[in-house]
Amino acid sequence: MSLDISKYPILALANTPDELRSLPKESLPALCDELRTYLLNSVSKTSGHLASGLGVVELTVALHYVYNTPFDQLIWDVGHQAYPHKILTGRREQLSTIRQKDGLHPFPWRGESEYDVLSVGHSSTSISAALGLAICAEKEQENRKIVSVIGDGAITAGMAFEALNHAGDIHPDMLVVLNDNEMSISENVGALNNQLARVLSGSLYTSIREGGKKVLSGTPTIKELLKRTEEHLKGMVVPGTMFEELGFNYIGPVDGHDVNELVRTLKNMRNLKGPQFLHIMTKKGKGYEPAEKDPISYHGVPKFDPSNTSLPKSSGGKPTFSAVFGDFLCDMAKEDSKLMAITPAMREGSGMVRFSKEYPNQYFDAAIAEQHAVTLASGMAIAGYNPIVAIYSTFLQRGYDQLIHDVAIMDLPVMFAIDRAGLVGADGQTHQGAFDISFMRCIPNMVIMTPSDENECRQMLYTGHKHTGPSAVRYPRGSATGIQVNNEMQALEIGKGRLLRETKVTEKGERVAILNFGTFLANSLEAAEKLDATVADMRFAKPLDEALICELVTNHDVLVTIEENAISGGAGSGVIEFLMKNRLVKPVLQLGLPDEFIAQGTQEEMHTELKLDANGIEQQIRDYLDL
């Protein structure tokens, strides 16, 4: 249910950027106040990403006020901060549906709006895409302006610097806005810097700067002296030398919460030639005190009451798989001083907060740098240590070459604790962990484990930690099953599954064996009760329990594989490959994720829609058997 827009009289006049640009600039501060309040009141009722959006309200207003969007193209990196952008681009009334099934996408999405130039979700892609757009805009002579907005976390990734380096080399007309909300680059914000930004972005300074370069082009010594003098003057108050050396004209830092100052600076910069870099300072969670004090907790929020000073606590009960992993880390570190835990900027999400505090010398946050994180682990393994890389399934995709080249080829003992495997829910297509079994199963030396519950997860983590080669344990987002966890840890036999239920059906053609990989086990068992089917918990997607498969083939008419991974190339495909190699001809029904990018919705909604809940599994098997 959308909010009553009559309570936001200025925002009501700015449903699109064209309407926004018709407003007098004097009304912009009040518009920002209303936009921030609207965002807070909306997200608190629906859940979603909050703190990032609160921090870029003024920037969003200023960009759409100065630039002729959608003709001028604006790209948001990652997209957590794009809620104000959605509100101002005709989607205000739909904001209450964000991250819900059939609702607004959680991130900028090309299929949703002409104002969303790039579909995003993963970090550090915006500058590369903006550069591609800028190159083509120049070739078409369209006088189209291209802007990329990237955060101080995302810009640390190698891909961002690769794009900056390329842009600085070929010199297209484009603007990169660095939204610095962690004070990690500079604390120089204030009147002096705002004044300097106006001067450095102004036409007089620019014409003198460019004209001087032409005049002095034949006198390199004097030209170099002038360049160094300029750098010295700018360096006294700005940290932009690095970006200048990459070939950008650096402006800033500027107060990112002074909308009129941003408008003035952006107007100056809009017509500058070559690659421009605007550094703004913002506060994540701006305007809502609890979010300002704890931006990490308020990054993604459940439904809550904004009048309370804290978020609602979870009801307890079943632990999450992430918490099971975090407990394992702490317990294992007591015994193993050579355990090294690595995460690419996912400490909270991966359940590593306690470990990072109790074992700070064994904890390494590699930032948003998955490639580096994987090869960092390989170096530790070569040195005789026992690294564990905690990473989301969707982000392991970004370190795939390193997984092969720097870990598997050398058969190094690196364990990957793969969180968010399978469907993640509200974050949609970019975050589904749909492909990890498929892309790891083809790598030699890999061991891939698929725990069915939290106790299995704990034992498999121990198994991987003790294994002498590369291994992976994949587990889903959210709560585990609630069973009693065995604190004593024991390594499982690699490649051995377990038979949990045997059919009593004797009628030929109807004897079904379900081969379960992962946390759909409860659904498989429930369906099996109605079908009187055999159920095997396979445990390992690689290596497969070939002896168990042979036994099931001998005694059953149909095999059914089930996994929360893409059917293409998944564990079920591995079963079929084994059968064909050994001339074991048997009908196999593969259940799993279809050959499509799956949109957002709750995990339960998507499991039901894809017929992977107990009823859906039963029905798919009955349809296959034509019962």
Curated annotation (Swiss-Prot):
Keywords: Isoprene biosynthesis, Magnesium, Metal-binding, Thiamine biosynthesis, Thiamine pyrophosphate, Transferase. Pfam families: DXP_synthase_N (PF13292), Transket_pyr (PF02779), Transketolase_C (PF02780). It catalyses: D-glyceraldehyde 3-phosphate + pyruvate + H(+) = 1-deoxy-D-xylulose 5-phosphate + CO2. It is an enzyme of class 2 (transferase). Its cofactor is Mg(2+); thiamine diphosphate. One of its GO terms (cellular component) is cytosol. Catalyzes the acyloin condensation reaction between C atoms 2 and 3 of pyruvate and glyceraldehyde 3-phosphate to yield 1-deoxy-D-xylulose-5-phosphate (DXP). This is 1-deoxy-D-xylulose-5-phosphate synthase.
